């Protein structure tokens, strides 16, 4: 019996080995071959007997028996009859699960078009027949005729005729032509299409046609027709003659109590199809009138449409409860569809979930598991052990013992759980550290205990979070859990390579308190023999924790032979630091402990420990730090009282000063000296500055206290104020929060992001009055609303990123490329935001680095292909090297995947990355995980306005030389430079010509220093008005107004008090309709009123004035070069939000073209201007060598940065604006676009203080660049203008080069991540991402093969993924397949030879062959 059962198990679990999956159209014969019988009746089951009706939708004869091994009438029961077909009811005796696999079919009485190929845009049927979709629909739904056979008449084939036209044609031509309606007609047309001829004909037209749109359309048709030819699909299969019926267990009918049934919507839809089909058959048999038959055919078409994709055409068919029925298409698409609900994510058994609490006494690799949970989760193991050890004779007995919870069960549980890791997961799992393995420790209670140090990785807290426990069952799973997922193996974060197991909050506070020093503490000045003595004195109460002492410290380090060498010194320290030294492992220097330890310092200590002493020491140290921190935090007794919030005495004065300044501005506004916008900006600036000053005063007050030392002198020491200690140590709170408690709350924002100009001057200690409280409620609500939106958006960004990068895996060691990208430090203003060492750490050099000695021959300092670790980065620093070329994922030459040299160090492990590492997914997680921390929108001054006064000058911080880049300037009346270019940079360079500072200088700034002039730190080198944007005169002369008509394009504002008039230009939206076309312009003319030209060109000097600009000149007044002609108040640009935060990151990765993007020069050459049209000017670039002149029409309101006669390089900015990544790629190349995207994304994250390694962003950029467009196809069979995978072009080019043929020339494309995911080679991956219907339609027509290269496809088909531990499994399969193919060919070779030679010769040859192929 057992053997029999085993036989059945084996029988069904055998799966075919497969390497690829193909999708294609099903031919009617194929559908019939799948089917086990035709479904003829719409009935489902008999309502009395509950047995399925014969030939109905649940028929047992077609689909199989309802009960295992039992026919429907009950004549044959049990296993012995298996395989018998009952002669009475016709049911085969077998397992009932065949009802999940066996399909049926419906023979349709009239052909029916498949709605996917008809309505899924672009319509495949329409494209193939070259008919508009509207015409095809009219034919299909029996409104018009289509000519299928034109004969000798004047009618065209595929011409659409209305009823009247058809009758006229019949009268005229009789039966010389044939026209039909319905799907029949379409099917005939499709069947009659000769694909090969059509294709050749189209290729001929393609070569002759010159219109772009026509070419595009023809190319589309060629691609579709070729797809049909190659895939051996027949076009007529897009029209169905046979409809397959889904197995009944996949569309179940479930009896509810009370005699009602719950049914899948598909049954309803099938029933409608069968009913209409049967009625149509009957009508055709009766030869009913044409009009009735036609109506029935149309209804059948609609029923089939609804079954396949309800709601795609017309109104969706609804069920009894008014909701649309779920069709086959709805079953697979969307979050609840087959792909995302059941294939990519499944519910898991052997799992449990519970609330988490703190386990402060656990070791890092442990978690506390409640006994009840453990007993339930490990049941099968316990049963097995009980039986094995003879406590229970059968499993049933064991079960009873476990249910009674006998004492022996608990002992066994202890035994089972030992060294059996479990996995803990906290939703949302944003990165791979959201699931880690721990060894369980049994505990009482019902909550899971979690080690406090892993909370940062899980982003968990103990306010009611829940976590899930999963048990790895097989030995391999346990091994992986222990070796790869154990929390002790995940010390470094994969996003940036820094420790993620870092103490926070209490622990930090405890260590900080312990390592602080206090003047005049008990025991100061003692000299001690070592840490043990220090602890002894502290425990006995003879010395204070903070007492300054001298102590003998022994430090160890490795010498050259790898032995420990020790050195002992007498060091100035404190009692607390000496006690802490006892837990620090051998090999770390005392200096790490001998300082006030804040969060950063502790992180550095752990990082150093990991790099110097490895993982084990680090884990032990982390645990010890945690225990110590908790203990001393408890001893410190730090707590917060209201008196800790000390309000500075200067606060009142500062606020009074600010208020008087605001009054002054108000008066200036009333006298008309400043506009409303300027007044608003200035008021906000005054309050922002006042807030800063109050905060500064408060921090000075809090941070230090004056005490008397033991010599009787007063000295300042860091304060022991509790709030200050918490903020200073980095345990909790920040200066901004303390500012609200003890300074002033400051400016608040309205919901639309504009700032309310009256600030809240009170703080929380003083308390807010009603008005102040009301103002501050805005911000609080907005915060909550934003958070909800943010989480959803961030999750969606992560999903798109994972989808685009999921198939990127490290597949080889070295691709031997010499290309790479150049790295230099990130400098913004006077600060180095990211030094070079942080950017290149863990990367591989692309070329040798030479020593930068000018006098000697430069010798190689670091050779190419070196992995830059901490040591080499120190070398770079010593030799003050400024730029380094490193290998990058973007430039890697591996065809499928990336090589480990181009990727560099695996950040989470600290050594070069292994083959099989899924770097794509890691990159996506690293970028997506901090997404929730990014703001949704950055206002120009965030929530509680957090910004000091606007910058209005450049004051430098280092001594050095001024270097001005991209500058165009004029000299004003005072002899100073005025900048008139828009992307000027001012850099300060030191004597080694390294950039120390770099600033953007705005248009209109006055620069006080010349280029290459020496400056010393603290000097102001440039200044400008931050509130307005000026228009600067570039020549001297007289002003002339054009189109400045009072009341139409401008309004004059006269000031009552001063009598000054200023002219304000109206925005086009504010003007009357007749004045919409006026272009208010200022022109500079000479004394006779003739045009003055820009020097060296024949362009007259004129300035178009944008709306809202203010002119304070009179027509005809004299002006001097460098004067301000008009001002544009900044408020207009201020209210436009800078897209920041998450939306900005999404825009960059989606490669969206910004509105009004910068215009770049398409070629290098000289600028000239051609004939203008009404609203645009014609810009021409003439290349210096021979070549065509490039022309472009640019709207007149765009401000140009170039003048006539100026030379520009390809990719130079002609008109300002945000740059479009597509333009950068086209004009400046892959490196530039990589640099642009990486820097822009990093700017957003850096603003939030999130560290992400550049290579993660580069990985995504590589995936965005994976397509290329063919420009010239060379000797290949690609079409011109076709978009192809870059790797396929590379492979094809290599092949062509070897054969000495013409190579393909191409340009790289930049696709947004959504587009790139949908454009992947794998249709399974694309379909499970978005637009499922479109992807599947397209792939099936093309008969695509999915090679199952990526991770997602393999998860969906249920195999190991080709990454991580599954990588070697896949490599082996490939190898095995290759080997067996080789054997096959050898076999065939041998059989061919043996027909001509003797047996002896054959055996000799065979041994020779085998010896040659056997591995040496």
Curated annotation (Swiss-Prot):
<feature type="binding site">
    <location>
        <position position="461"/>
    </location>
    <ligand>
        <name>Mg(2+)</name>
    </ligand>
</feature>
<feature type="binding site">
    <location>
        <position position="465"/>
    </location>
    <ligand>
        <name>Mg(2+)</name>
    </ligand>
</feature>
<comment type="subunit">
    <text>The RNAP catalytic core consists of 2 alpha, 1 beta, 1 beta' and 1 omega subunit. When a sigma factor is associated with the core the holoenzyme is formed, which can initiate transcription.</text>
</comment>
<dbReference type="InterPro" id="IPR045867">
    <property type="entry name" value="DNA-dir_RpoC_beta_prime"/>
</dbReference>
<feature type="binding site">
    <location>
        <position position="892"/>
    </location>
    <ligand>
        <name>Zn(2+) 2</name>
    </ligand>
</feature>
<dbReference type="GO" id="GO:0000428">
    <property type="term" value="C:DNA-directed RNA polymerase complex"/>
</dbReference>
<feature type="binding site">
    <location>
        <position position="902"/>
    </location>
    <ligand>
        <name>Zn(2+) 2</name>
    </ligand>
</feature>
<keyword id="KW-0479">Metal-binding</keyword>
<dbReference type="GO" id="GO:0000287">
    <property type="term" value="F:magnesium ion binding"/>
</dbReference>
<dbReference type="InterPro" id="IPR007083">
    <property type="entry name" value="RNA_pol_Rpb1_4"/>
</dbReference>
<feature type="binding site">
    <location>
        <position position="89"/>
    </location>
    <ligand>
        <name>Zn(2+) 1</name>
    </ligand>
</feature>
<dbReference type="InterPro" id="IPR038120">
    <property type="entry name" value="Rpb1_funnel_sf"/>
</dbReference>
<keyword id="KW-0862">Zinc</keyword>
<dbReference type="Pfam" id="PF00623">
    <property type="entry name" value="RNA_pol_Rpb1_2"/>
</dbReference>
<dbReference type="GO" id="GO:0008270">
    <property type="term" value="F:zinc ion binding"/>
</dbReference>
<keyword id="KW-0460">Magnesium</keyword>
<dbReference type="InterPro" id="IPR042102">
    <property type="entry name" value="RNA_pol_Rpb1_3_sf"/>
</dbReference>
<dbReference type="InterPro" id="IPR006592">
    <property type="entry name" value="RNA_pol_N"/>
</dbReference>
<feature type="binding site">
    <location>
        <position position="463"/>
    </location>
    <ligand>
        <name>Mg(2+)</name>
    </ligand>
</feature>
<keyword id="KW-0240">DNA-directed RNA polymerase</keyword>
<protein>
    <recommendedName>
        <fullName>DNA-directed RNA polymerase subunit beta'</fullName>
        <ecNumber>2.7.7.6</ecNumber>
    </recommendedName>
</protein>
<dbReference type="InterPro" id="IPR007080">
    <property type="entry name" value="RNA_pol_Rpb1_1"/>
</dbReference>
<feature type="binding site">
    <location>
        <position position="86"/>
    </location>
    <ligand>
        <name>Zn(2+) 1</name>
    </ligand>
</feature>
<dbReference type="GO" id="GO:0003677">
    <property type="term" value="F:DNA binding"/>
</dbReference>
<dbReference type="Pfam" id="PF05000">
    <property type="entry name" value="RNA_pol_Rpb1_4"/>
</dbReference>
<dbReference type="InterPro" id="IPR007066">
    <property type="entry name" value="RNA_pol_Rpb1_3"/>
</dbReference>
<keyword id="KW-0808">Transferase</keyword>
<dbReference type="GO" id="GO:0003899">
    <property type="term" value="F:DNA-directed RNA polymerase activity"/>
</dbReference>
<dbReference type="InterPro" id="IPR012754">
    <property type="entry name" value="DNA-dir_RpoC_beta_prime_bact"/>
</dbReference>
<dbReference type="InterPro" id="IPR007081">
    <property type="entry name" value="RNA_pol_Rpb1_5"/>
</dbReference>
<dbReference type="GO" id="GO:0006351">
    <property type="term" value="P:DNA-templated transcription"/>
</dbReference>
<dbReference type="Pfam" id="PF04998">
    <property type="entry name" value="RNA_pol_Rpb1_5"/>
</dbReference>
<keyword id="KW-0804">Transcription</keyword>
<dbReference type="Pfam" id="PF04983">
    <property type="entry name" value="RNA_pol_Rpb1_3"/>
</dbReference>
<feature type="binding site">
    <location>
        <position position="899"/>
    </location>
    <ligand>
        <name>Zn(2+) 2</name>
    </ligand>
</feature>
<comment type="similarity">
    <text>Belongs to the RNA polymerase beta' chain family.</text>
</comment>
<feature type="binding site">
    <location>
        <position position="73"/>
    </location>
    <ligand>
        <name>Zn(2+) 1</name>
    </ligand>
</feature>
<dbReference type="InterPro" id="IPR044893">
    <property type="entry name" value="RNA_pol_Rpb1_clamp_domain"/>
</dbReference>
<feature type="binding site">
    <location>
        <position position="71"/>
    </location>
    <ligand>
        <name>Zn(2+) 1</name>
    </ligand>
</feature>
<dbReference type="InterPro" id="IPR000722">
    <property type="entry name" value="RNA_pol_asu"/>
</dbReference>
<comment type="function">
    <text>DNA-dependent RNA polymerase catalyzes the transcription of DNA into RNA using the four ribonucleoside triphosphates as substrates.</text>
</comment>
<dbReference type="Pfam" id="PF04997">
    <property type="entry name" value="RNA_pol_Rpb1_1"/>
</dbReference>
């Amino acid at each position: 019996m057992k053997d029999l059962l085993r036989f059945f198990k084996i029988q069904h679990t055998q799966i075919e080995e497969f390497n690829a999956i193909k999708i294609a159209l099903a031919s009617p014969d194929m559908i019939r071959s799948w089917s086990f019988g035709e479904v003829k009746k719409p009935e489902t089951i008999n309502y009395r007997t509950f047995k399925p009706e014969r030939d109905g939708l649940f028929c047992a004869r077609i689909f199989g028996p309802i009960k295992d091994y039992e026919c429907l009438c009950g004549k044959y029961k049990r296993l012995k009859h298996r395989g018998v077909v009952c002669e009475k009811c016709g049911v085969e005796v077998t397992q009932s699960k065949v009802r999940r696999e066996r399909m049926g079919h419906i023979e349709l009485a009239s052909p029916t078009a498949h709605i996917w190929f008809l309505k899924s845009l672009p319509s495949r049927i329409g494209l193939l027949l070259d008919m508009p979709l509207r015409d095809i629909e009219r034919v299909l739904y029996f409104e018009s005729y289509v000519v299928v056979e034109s004969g000798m008449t004047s009618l065209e084939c595929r011409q659409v005729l209305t009823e009247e036209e058809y009758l006229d044609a019949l009268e005229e031509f009789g039966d010389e032509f044939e026209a039909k309606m319905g799907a029949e007609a379409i099917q005939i047309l499709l069947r009659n299409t000769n694909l090969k001829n059509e294709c050749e004909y189209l290729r001929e037209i393609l070569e002759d046609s010159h219109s772009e749109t026509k070419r595009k359309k023809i190319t589309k048709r060629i691609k579709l027709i070729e797809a049909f030819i190659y895939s051996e699909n027949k076009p007529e299969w897009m029209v169905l003659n046979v409809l397959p019926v889904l197995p009944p267990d996949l569309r179940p009918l479930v009896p509810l109590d009370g005699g009602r049934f719950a049914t899948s919507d598909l049954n309803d839809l099938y029933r409608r199809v069968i009913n209409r089909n049967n009625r149509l058959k009957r009508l055709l048999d009766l030869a009913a009138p044409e009009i009735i038959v036609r109506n029935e055919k149309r209804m059948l078409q609609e029923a089939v449409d609804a079954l396949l994709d309800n709601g795609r055409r017309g109104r969706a068919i609804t069920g009894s409860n008014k909701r649309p029925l779920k069709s086959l298409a709805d079953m697979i698409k969307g979050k609840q569809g087959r792909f995302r609900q059941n294939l990519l994510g499944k519910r898991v058994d052997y799992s449990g979930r519970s609330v988490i609490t703190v386990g402060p006494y656990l070791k890092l690799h442990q978690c506390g598991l409640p006994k009840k949970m453990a007993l339930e989760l490990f049941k099968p193991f316990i049963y097995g052990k009980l039986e094995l050890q003879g406590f229970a004779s059968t499993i049933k007995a064991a079960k009873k013992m476990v249910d009674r919870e006998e004492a022996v069960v608990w002992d066994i549980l202890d035994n089972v759980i030992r060294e059996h890791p479990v996995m803990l997961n906290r939703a949302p799992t944003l990165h791979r550290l959201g699931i880690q393995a721990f060894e369980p420790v049994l505990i009482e209670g019902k909550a899971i205990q979690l080690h406090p140090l892993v909370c940062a990785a899980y982003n968990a807290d103990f306010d009611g979070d829940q976590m899930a426990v999963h048990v790895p069952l097989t030995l391999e799973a346990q091994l992986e859990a222990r070796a790869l997922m154990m929390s002790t193996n995940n010390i470094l974060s994969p996003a940036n390579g820094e420790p993620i197991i870092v103490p926070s909050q209490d622990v930090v506070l405890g260590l900080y308190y312990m390592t602080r020093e206090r003047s005049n503490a008990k025991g100061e000045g003692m000299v001690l023999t070592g840490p043990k003595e220090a602890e002894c004195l502290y425990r006995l109460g003879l010395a204070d924790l903070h007492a300054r002492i001298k102590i003998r410290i022994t430090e160890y380090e490795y010498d050259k032979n790898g032995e420990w060498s020790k050195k002992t010194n007498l060091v100035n320290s404190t009692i607390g630091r000496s006690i802490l030294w006892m837990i620090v492992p051998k090999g770390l220097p005392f200096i790490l402990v001998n300082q006030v330890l804040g969060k950063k310092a502790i992180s550095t200590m752990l990082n150093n420990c990991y790099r110097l002493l490895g993982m084990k020491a680090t884990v032990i140290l982390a645990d010890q730090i945690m225990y110590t921190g908790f203990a001393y935090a408890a001893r410190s007794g730090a707590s917060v009282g209201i008196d800790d919030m000390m309000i500075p005495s200067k606060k009142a004065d500062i606020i009074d000063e600010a208020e008087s300044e605001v009054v002054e501005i108000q008066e200036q506004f009333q006298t008309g000296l400043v506009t409303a916008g300027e007044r608003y900006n200035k008021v906000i600036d005054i309050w922002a500055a006042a807030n800063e000053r109050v905060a500064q005063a408060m921090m000075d007050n809090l941070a230090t206290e004056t005490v008397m030392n033991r010599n009787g002198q007063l000295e300042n020491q860091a304060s022991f104020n509790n709030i200050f200690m918490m903020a200073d140590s980095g345990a909790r709170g920040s200066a901004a929060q303390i500012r609200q408690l003890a300074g002033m709350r400051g400016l608040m924002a309205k919901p639309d992001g504009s700032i309310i100009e009256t600030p809240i001057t009170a703080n929380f200690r003083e308390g807010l009055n009603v008005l102040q409280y009301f103002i501050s409620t805005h911000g609080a609500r907005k915060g909550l609303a934003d958070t909800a939106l943010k989480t959803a958006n961030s999750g969606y960004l992560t999903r798109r990123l994972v989808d685009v990068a999921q198939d990127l895996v490290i597949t080889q060691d070295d691709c031997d490329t010499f290309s790479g990208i150049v790295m230099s430090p990130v400098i913004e203003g006077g600060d180095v935001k990211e030094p070079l060492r942080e950017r290149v750490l863990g990367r591989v050099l692309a070329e040798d680095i030479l020593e930068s000695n000018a006098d000697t021959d430069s010798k190689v300092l670091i050779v190419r292909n070196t992995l830059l670790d901490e040591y080499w980065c120190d070398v770079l620093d010593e030799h003050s090297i400024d730029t380094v070329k490193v290998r990058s994922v973007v430039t890697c030459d591996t065809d499928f995947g990336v090589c480990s040299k181009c990727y560099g160090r695996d950040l989470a492990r600290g050594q070069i990355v292994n083959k099989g590492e899924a770097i794509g997914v890691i990159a996506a997680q690293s970028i997506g995980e901090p997404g929730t921390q990014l703001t949704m929108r950055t206002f120009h001054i965030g929530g509680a306005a957090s910004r000091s006064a606007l910058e209005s000058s450049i004051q430098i911080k280092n001594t050095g030389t001024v270097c001005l880049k991209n500058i165009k300037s004029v000299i004003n009346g005072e002899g100073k430079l005025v900048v008139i270019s828009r992307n000027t940079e001012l850099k300060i360079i030191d004597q080694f010509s390294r950039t120390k500072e770099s600033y953007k200088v705005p248009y209109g700034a006055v620069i006080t220093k010349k280029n290459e002039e020496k400056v010393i730190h603290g000097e102001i080198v440039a200044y400008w008005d931050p509130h307005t944007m000026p228009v600067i005169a570039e020549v001297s002369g007289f002003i002339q107004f054009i189109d400045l008509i009072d009341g139409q394009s401008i309004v004059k504002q006269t000031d009552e008090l001063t009598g000054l008039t200023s002219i304000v230009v109206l925005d086009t939206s504010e003007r009357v309709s007749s004045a919409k076309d006026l272009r208010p312009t200022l022109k500079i003319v000479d004394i006779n009123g003739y045009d003055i030209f820009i020097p060296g060109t024949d362009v007259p000097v004129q300035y178009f004035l944008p709306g809202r600009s203010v002119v304070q000149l009179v027509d005809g007044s004299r002006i001097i070069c460098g004067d301000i002609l008009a001002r544009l108040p900044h408020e207009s640009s201020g209210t436009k939000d800078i897209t920041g935060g998450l939306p900005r990151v999404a825009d960059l990765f989606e490669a969206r073209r910004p509105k009004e993007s910068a215009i770049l020069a398409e070629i290098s050459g000289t600028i000239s201007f051609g004939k203008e049209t009404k609203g645009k000017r014609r810009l021409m670039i003439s290349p210096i060598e021979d070549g065509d002149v490039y022309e472009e029409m640019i709207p007149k309101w765009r401000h140009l940065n170039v003048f006539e006669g100026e030379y520009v390089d390809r990719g130079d900015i002609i008109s300002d604006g945000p740059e479009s990544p597509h333009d950068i790629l086209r004009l400046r190349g892959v490196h530039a676009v990589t640099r642009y995207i990486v820097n822009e994304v990093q700017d957003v994250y850096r603003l939030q203080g999130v560290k992400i390694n550049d290579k993660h962003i580069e990985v995504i950029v590589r995936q965005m660049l994976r397509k290329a467009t063919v420009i010239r196809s060379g000797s290949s069979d690609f079409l011109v203008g076709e978009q192809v995978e870059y790797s396929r072009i590379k492979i094809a080019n290599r092949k062509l080069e070897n054969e000495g043929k013409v190579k393909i020339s191409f340009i790289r494309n930049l696709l947004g991540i959504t587009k790139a995911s949908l454009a992947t080679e794998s249709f399974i991956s694309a379909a499970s991402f978005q637009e499922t219907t479109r992807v599947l339609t397209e792939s099936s027509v093309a008969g695509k093969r999915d090679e199952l290269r990526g991770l997602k496809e393999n998860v969906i088909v249920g195999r190991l993924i080709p990454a991580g531990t599954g990588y070697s499994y896949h490599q082996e399969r490939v190898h095995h397949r290759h080997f067996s193919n080789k054997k096959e060919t050898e076999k065939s070779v041998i059989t061919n030879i043996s027909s001509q030679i003797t047996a002896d010769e054959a055996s000799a040859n065979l041994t020779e062959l085998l010896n040659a192929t056997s591995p040496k």
